[in-house]
Amino acid sequence: MNDLMKILGQTGQAATFDQIRIQIASPEQIRSWSYGEIKKPETINYRTFKPERDGLFCARIFGPIKDYECLCGKYKRMKFRGIICEKCGVEVTLAKVRRERMGHIELASPVAHIWFLKSLPSRIATMVEMTLKDLEKVLYFENYIVLDPYTTDLKRYQLLSEDDLYAKQDEFGEDGFKAGIGAEAVKSILAGIDLEAERAIMRADLKEATSEAKRKKLVKRLKLVEAFIESGTRPEWMIMDVVPVIPPELRPLVPLDGGRFATSDLNDLYRRVINRNNRLKRLIELRAPDIIVRNEKRMLQESVDALFDNGRRGRAITGTNKRPLKSLSDMLKGKQGRFRQNLLGKRVDYSGRSVIVVGPELKLHQCGLPKKMALELFKPFIYAKLEKYGLATTIKAAKRMVEKERPEVWDILEEVIREHPVLLNRAPTLHRLGIQAFEPILIEGKAIQLHPLVCTAFNADFDGDQMAVHVPLSIEAQLEARVLMMSTNNILNPANGKPIIVPSQDIVLGLYYLSLETPAFTGVEDKEAPLFGTMGEIEHALDSGYLKLHDKIRARVVRTHPDGSRTTEVVPTTPGRMMIGQLLPKHHDVPFALVNQLLTKKKVSDVIDAVYRHCGQKESVIFCDRLMGLGFRQAAKAGISFGKDDMVIPAEKYGLLEKTQAEVKEYEAQYHDGLITAGERYNKVIDAWSRCNDEVAAAMMREISRQDPGKPTNSVWMMSHSGARGSPTQMRQLAGMRGLMAKPSGEIIEQPILSNFKEGLTVAEYFNSTHGARKGLADTALKTANSGYLTRRLVDVAQDCIIVTADCGTERGLTMRAVMDGGEVVSSLSERILGRTAAEDVLDPADGSVIVKANELIGEIDSMHIEKLGVESVKIRSVLTCEAKVGVCAKCYGRDLARGTPVNIGEAVGVIAAQSIGEPGTQLTMRTFHIGGAAQRGAEQSSVEASHDGTVTIRNRNVVSNSAGAPIVMSRNCEIALNDASGRERARFRVPYGARLLVDEDQTVTRGQKLAEWDPYTLPIITERAGLVEYADLLEGVTLVERVDEVTGLTSKVVVDYKQSAKGADLRPRLILKDERGEVLRLANGAEARYFLSPDSILSVENGASVHAGDVLARIPREGSKTRDITGGLPRVAELFEARRPKDHAIIAETDGRVEFGKDYKAKRRIIVKNDETGEETEYLVPKGKHVSVQEGDYVHRGDPLVDGPRVPHDILRVLGVEALSEYLINEIQDVYRLQGVKINDKHIEVVVRQMLQKIEITEPGDTTYLVGELVDRIEFDEENERRLRAGERPAGGLPVLQGITKASLQTLSFISAASFQETTRVLTEAATAGKTDQLLGLKENVIVGRLIPAGTGSVMSRLRSIAAGRDRSTLAATRPALPARDEVSAD
């Protein structure tokens, strides 16, 4: 068997392996890999072009240049295989051994490996307990180090300069102490370390360590020492005596024409090392002066550094053309490195690419393939068939036939192509629907024909897009292409489970036109409309001109019942709708009523969804194809077009403009009178124009959508309303007003563009609008890259999340509620629980009966039923609470959104989640400029209106009446809830502090009625009691300044952040309320009436003034608003996934309790939250400039903000736990996407958040070997604790930690995956010192080592393999029990 292997040139290594380990190589290991030492820097002889002996390409070491031929030509042919030529010393074998044989260089002096020296934290420095700076001084021959002081007063490892050394030697004598320099000295220190003893000493020290810094230092070194012990490596191996040389074929030297050579940079770097090494050997032999030898050693160290990682230390070594040479590290690093360029991104053979054109006559599963392309792609198949049928005798003959394009070739091509799917791909492939399989149809011409309905999935249009065609060769590949990738099997979008095979543009317009109803007949009673019995009659009437498509008629429609019986009924409809109704499959859940309405794009999507859910895939594919045909035909017949007059400018536009201009003037006047500040005026002006713009737009929409009898429907309105093309915002700019524009800085220019494109812009307006337009284009270019990078990070963090088991058996879950925003339901309960598994029985609130049992999947019918019954919240299983060891279980994941069925085991849900989140990011960023940078900013919310009719309940009510008698909200968490007649809560609104309440408890309100209003631009400070104001610590010119407004000449008193004086007089600006007797008033909660003022507060009362309860004492202005578009959105999503701390973040209370203000620090205020029951105090330090949103004496609950601002996810996790964190992250991320109208299912975000919560921080080590503060993987943590409990020891305690996606990717268990992501050198250095083992569980590491991925069909293969291996083992054990255990393993 071995001989056969030799002939085939295969090595005898194991073909299968289950894990890969990385370690630091010992010098012995490096020598054992090597086939000989390289002694000379020569490469090849310039005359003979043969490799030089003992040089970098030596054939004696690395193997022959030609197969089975030695260098001197004495032995040729296969029969001399394995002989070593006695003349030239070359083994006669395959030339490809030059790709796998290594050599080595014996160094004259040891050198440090730069990765272990410079990759932070420096491993060598940690081991020898020196700073990196000092260590470098020793290694690069600047300072000596005392290795053993003997009896002198020198310290061990003390650094000495050359002069110091001579002085000390004079003092203590030459042999009075031992000093060294360079890598030799460091190596002797490392060799002298007894790892086991060190560990014991450090563990003892750690128990006694008090200071945090000392602990950290000890822990760092202890971990490193333990890593060395566990991996069985020695620290001195980080210093090298031998340098390995990689095989010559991996650093080739290729002759160019003209007698020059192109070479890999590595050869230069190796040459440099060899030259310096040989020179050093010679100098040592010659007994050269110490200083020369030292210099040569330093140069050797630098050349080895450059070989391993050029540019890591000092200046990079450059080649002839001033460009830095590519070292071994650079070969691995970055986009062009080995990992990303060759292992993860391989190129494909058997592919072609061409421009795409539309193919409306294709079926959904077909694509048109140009004959020329097909001939080229299917060549091998054609050759085989030609030979098989005896049409060609040899492959050569077949080749000639194909080249001549003989007629029989085309017949054979037809036969080969039949039912052989091809893959079509459009770059950029943002999600898995960017590659789909189709059956090719041969066409003339040179362009690929694409089915119009799949354009959405590919994000393709026909303005010159190109697509690539790939041919799956093996029968397995064809099978997978057909079953998994066929376009007919990908009807639903994996991101949200909605159909993605939806009509767009002309098809939508055609169907919309077809389902219109003529306004003339709207008034006609249904009974009077003509009655038709069959479709034939209707068609006859249409052809004869008796009926128009849009006339109202009554028609007989067949209705199918659940038991299969059919009845007919008469329904009012139009001939057009009847035509669409004819296409519907016959099913009781797909009634004619679905299409008996005006069909917009969304409605058409709903129809397709219903057909898919109830009638299955085949029916829906046929339905979609027929619908497309009908849509195209009708759109062509209708001949819809629009002219200038279709853009109607509303008559009331000019009135609205005048009214707003008057408002703006009024604000100017108020500002000049000093009633409002400049910032408030700006905000109010912007608001007024925003409102005006909306009103003009509404007027224009009313005008355009008016349907006058006898007049055709406005075409622009039809296009926009149907969803075919154009949005209301675009129409607003054409016929309303362009509105507000943003400056390049992001602020809004307060003079809006009053004209629209139909009227034309003035020069000034045109100039103002150029900012926005240009910003849009610049954004697009930048954001595409950002979005791609976000997707890459998401894929990397989630790639090893795979469905591994059917059920993990957990009882835990998340509680789902409808998401409300300003009283509107933005995401209903039924949407959120659809396709999830119930964690506990869902009960009917009326009678307590079970609607859905625990661990059952909630389907469409169930979810609608639950919502109708008014269930508040449902507890569902979630991947966040799944207890599967690796990956997640099918029950916790729920429904596979792309199939509408429970998810299969082996589905790569992590990658799907990453693609679903990343794909819209790219699309959205490309979409910003369509609105031309018009500032889209709604008016700031300044009131709440009832969204339903109902009765009012006010929660946390704390109200005072102000001097005008209006009730003012004094509570910081007041909410107004609306209940319907049955007492169920329909909406809930948050009312801010200082708002005016316009309704009272139990009052009945109607929809649209205002409930409360407030000033959105300032935060007021309001008094609860009447009394006299007294200023405290408000000193003119110190904490209080009078600001004079340049424009109005009015002054206002503003509190400023004062610089602390040296005397340290602690000033805390505040207002105190006193009664007539001068006593300080008490508030309702018993605290004294003191109001602390933060900087920038504007005082509204004078010192000594008398105030009424509910009056405003001071206002804090909020900053002006910036434009909101996804540009703010994409970085926001990245910020959330990276778990960054937002700037000016909120500070939240970690316990319940009362607020007190402690003594201030220099630049911080101290807030103390004191719990009344336990008496424990928690202290928070807040920068002075921040506005504290609580007053002294307020009672706060755990999680309430003490300082306003965006919340920090880490705080939420620490204070409120995993469920609150997941809810926060999901809602925040969904908000960004919702703003753009993108639907993503929650479970995708949950999958990524699960990956971010993989690590646990140890708080209590118990009897484990863990250290406090160490980050441990959740799985390892649980396993270790189980082991400890079984042994009867104390388990470790820990808290979950939230990591950003980049950090989580780099901390993953697989070092191969982490290295291919980012910071390759750091990851590999860390893995090598720890001797890490990669279990090859994720997708990425398996792709890199070239195996099938353990997901999908690959997961089945790996399962079968492990079962078979186990069976083999047990069989072997049974048959040959006497054999030693070693053979059992090799039986694998």
From Swiss-Prot:
S-S pairs: none
Record-level GO BP terms: DNA-templated transcription
Entry's Gene Ontology molecular function annotations: DNA binding; DNA-directed RNA polymerase activity; magnesium ion binding; zinc ion binding
Keyword entries, A-Z: DNA-directed RNA polymerase, Magnesium, Metal-binding, Nucleotidyltransferase, Transcription, Transferase, Zinc
Signal peptide positions on this chain: none
Cofactor remark from the record: Binds 1 Mg(2+) ion per subunit.
Pfam families the record matches: RNA_pol_Rpb1_1 (PF04997), RNA_pol_Rpb1_2 (PF00623), RNA_pol_Rpb1_3 (PF04983), RNA_pol_Rpb1_4 (PF05000), RNA_pol_Rpb1_5 (PF04998)
Gene3D superfamilies in the record: 1.10.132.30, 1.10.150.390, 1.10.1790.20, 1.10.40.90, 2.40.40.20, 2.40.50.100, RNA polymerase II, clamp domain, RNA polymerase Rpb1, domain 3
Cofactor(s), names only, from the UniProt record: Mg(2+); Zn(2+)
Catalyzed chemical reaction(s): RNA(n) + a ribonucleoside 5'-triphosphate = RNA(n+1) + diphosphate
Listed GO CC annotations: DNA-directed RNA polymerase complex
EC number of this enzyme: 2.7.7.6
Residues bound to Zn(2+) 1: C70, C72, C85, C88
Binding positions (Mg(2+)): D461, D463, D465
Metal-binding as UniProt keyword: yes
Superkingdom classification of source: Bacteria
Residues noted as binding Zn(2+) 2 in the record, renumbered to the chain: C808, C882, C889, C892
Record note on quaternary structure: The RNAP catalytic core consists of 2 alpha, 1 beta, 1 beta' and 1 omega subunit. When a sigma factor is associated with the core the holoenzyme is formed, which can initiate transcription.
Function: DNA-dependent RNA polymerase catalyzes the transcription of DNA into RNA using the four ribonucleoside triphosphates as substrates.
Recorded family membership: Belongs to the RNA polymerase beta' chain family.
Protein name per Swiss-Prot or TrEMBL: DNA-directed RNA polymerase subunit beta'
Source species taxonomy: Bacteria, Pseudomonadati, Pseudomonadota, Alphaproteobacteria, Acetobacterales
